[in-house]
């Protein structure tokens, strides 16, 4: 190509409305999933759709610039990205920080830390470091969804540099494509390897290294199918093939939105890769200028939503987190969802019109202190008003209203507890949760010194730990928030292998955080030999509740040394037992569950 580098005029790539239509489908799936998982169990796959689109579109823009000018102006690219993404995020962070201070002040430290991570676009690594479960919706974390933006921004920072280097050193583009394909396979392998080691969904879900596979598939498509080189009038048979493959892929993707859930293990063993390939086929058909599927995705309603997909994504989760925190999860009235949707639309539209669009077009000039420029002046006044409490939050001026660490060393418990990120261990003395100090409440004076059971469980066990220990001083309690049944066998082998005699009593309260198989349950039960085992079933507003309770009941029928403690039945109709998440226990719930367990243990 004969051109002087940097001087040939760059022609802007044509607008592709079908991609906005696809963005609309993706963001609607995500919003529905976060409103209520049971409505669209695989809606979280919309994030992967965004990743593939981002990889494809960014690479296409960069390749177009390189083909037109012989150079890629990295500084200009990064400035455009910042103008497009950063202002709306900063406003979201300021609003969420201020709202947390006013409405949820006991969470201010947690949210402050999340804000700092979001500012530097490292939210995903922050949540990995704090062992946060993405699919766990029991805690108030209104910025947790920013993990995906962190991955995209990290991609925007490093990928262009790598692309420019490869373009300047390797002349054959198919070789560059093979390099990116190889890296995507490595990323896929990392996800499969890490998941096989510890079965940790969140590590592989949040990790830039493990999610890079999806972005790079979009990159590869840009090399194979650049939108600026597609012909307007291909042969009819070609259009038919493109439309057929794209339509079939879209139908399968939508079916997966309904079929897959966060407990579907195969998606971590290559599933995300295959699903992203489906998205590639959809994109390939949508960006072609002559296909009918492109016309369908260019529907004005879908395009309208798609153009606002960034703002909708930013605001929906924060709105849902605040609104739902005042209701019991699983018992949310229908009108609350209308409130969620209405507030999301309002905030997203305000953000799109008055933050996202002006800053994208004008940059810092979108702010102005001169009253004659009314929109800019109002925008500036609002930003400054929010900025004052925001900066005070960041410097820790309001830390006194929230607590970051709870629990103390007590008796035989390991009580190094981080409340904010779901790492509580059952304490005995004072409990500090989200800034609230809960002194021991006066309970029944009955003390049972003649039994010494082992209790293993998740966050519900943590909730009853203090109360149960006061009634059964010789009990041994091991509760950890987020624990799942499949994670418990190594713990038992390492620490509790002595509980195998027929005189031993073992209480297992597991199932709050996810499903398990018959084999996983039996392997755990068999580890306790002849001990009397008591299985506490669960009440959790999640799709796996019924199956968990069925497996526990079946085990009690199959094994003579296993007894079912029917917490599901005992708690039926007692919303006063539960915190707003519908799972964790208020004081009355603590006493009720303790009573159920004690009744079973006293029968021996």
Curated annotation (Swiss-Prot):
Source species: Staphylococcus aureus (strain COL)
EC code: 2.3.1.-
Designated name of the protein: Putative O-acetyltransferase SACOL0978
GO molecular function: acyltransferase activity, transferring groups other than amino-acyl groups
Keyword Acyltransferase among record annotations: yes
Primary localization: membrane
A biological process from GO: lipopolysaccharide biosynthetic process
PANTHER family: ACETYLTRANSFERASE, ACYL_TRANSF_3 DOMAIN-CONTAINING PROTEIN
Subcellular localization(s) per the UniProt record: Cell membrane
Active-site residues (renumbered): 459, 581, 584
């Amino acid at each position: 190509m004969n051109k002087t580098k940097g001087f040939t005029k760059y022609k802007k790539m044509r607008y592709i409305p079908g991609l906005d239509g696809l963005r609309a489908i993706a963001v609607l799936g995500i919003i529905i999933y976060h409103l209520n998982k049971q409505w669209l169990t695989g809606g979280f796959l919309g994030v992967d759709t965004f990743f593939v689109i981002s990889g494809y579109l960014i690479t296409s823009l960069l390749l177009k610039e390189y083909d037109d000018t012989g150079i890629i102006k990295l500084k200009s690219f990064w400035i455009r990205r910042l103008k497009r993404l950063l202002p709306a995020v900063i406003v979201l962070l300021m609003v969420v920080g201020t709202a947390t201070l006013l409405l949820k002040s006991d969470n201010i430290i947690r949210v402050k830390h999340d804000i700092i991570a979001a500012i530097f676009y490292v939210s995903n690594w922050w949540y990995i470091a704090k062992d946060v479960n993405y699919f766990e919706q029991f805690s108030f974390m209104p910025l947790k969804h920013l993990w995906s933006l962190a991955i995209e921004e990290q991609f925007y920072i490093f990928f262009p540099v790598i692309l420019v280097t490869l373009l300047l050193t390797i002349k054959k583009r198919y070789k560059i494509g093979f390099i990116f394909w190889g890296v995507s396979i490595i990323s896929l392998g990392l996800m499969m390897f890490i998941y096989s080691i510890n079965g940790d969904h969140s590590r592989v879900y949040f990790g830039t290294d493990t999610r890079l596979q999806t972005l790079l598939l979009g990159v590869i498509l840009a090399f194979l199918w650049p939108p600026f080189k597609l012909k307007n009038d291909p042969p009819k048979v070609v259009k038919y093939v493109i439309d057929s493959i794209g339509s079939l892929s879209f139908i399968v993707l939508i079916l997966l939105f309904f079929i897959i859930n966060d407990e579907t293990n195969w998606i971590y063993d290559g599933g995300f890769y295959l699903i992203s390939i489906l998205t590639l086929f959809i994109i390939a058909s949508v960006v072609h200028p002559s296909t009918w599927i492109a016309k369908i995705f260019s529907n004005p309603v879908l395009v309208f939503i798609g153009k606002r997909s960034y703002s909708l994504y930013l605001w929906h989760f924060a709105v849902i987190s605040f609104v739902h925190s005042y209701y019991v999860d699983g018992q949310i009235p229908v009108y609350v969802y209308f409130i969620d949707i209405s507030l999301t639309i309002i905030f997203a539209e305000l953000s799109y019109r008055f933050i996202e669009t002006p800053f994208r077009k004008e940059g810092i000039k979108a702010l102005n202190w001169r009253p004659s420029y009314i929109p800019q002046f109002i925008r500036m006044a609002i930003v400054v008003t929010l900025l004052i409490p925001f900066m005070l939050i960041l410097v820790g001026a309001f830390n006194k209203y929230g607590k970051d660490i709870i629990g103390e060393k007590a008796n035989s418990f390991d009580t190094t507890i981080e409340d904010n990120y779901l790492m509580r261990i059952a304490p005995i003395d004072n409990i500090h949760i989200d800034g609230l100090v809960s002194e021991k409440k006066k309970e029944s004076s009955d003390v049972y010194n003649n039994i010494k059971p082992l209790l293993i469980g998740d966050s519900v066990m943590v909730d009853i730990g203090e109360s149960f220990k006061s009634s059964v001083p010789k009990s041994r309690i091991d509760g950890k928030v987020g624990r799942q049944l499949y994670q418990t066998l190594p713990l038992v082998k390492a620490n509790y292998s002595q509980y195998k005699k027929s005189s031993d009593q073992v209480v297992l309260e597991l199932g709050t955080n996810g499903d398990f198989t018959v084999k996983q349950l039996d392997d755990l039960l068999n580890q306790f030999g002849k001990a009397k085992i008591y299985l506490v079933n669960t009440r959790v507003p999640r799709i796996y509740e019924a199956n968990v309770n069925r497996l526990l009941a079946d085990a009690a029928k199959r094994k003579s040394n296993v007894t079912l403690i029917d917490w599901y039945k005992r708690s039926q109709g007692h919303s006063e037992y539960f915190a707003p998440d519908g799972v964790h226990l208020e004081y009355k719930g603590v006493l009720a569950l303790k009573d159920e367990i004690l009744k079973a243990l006293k029968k021996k």
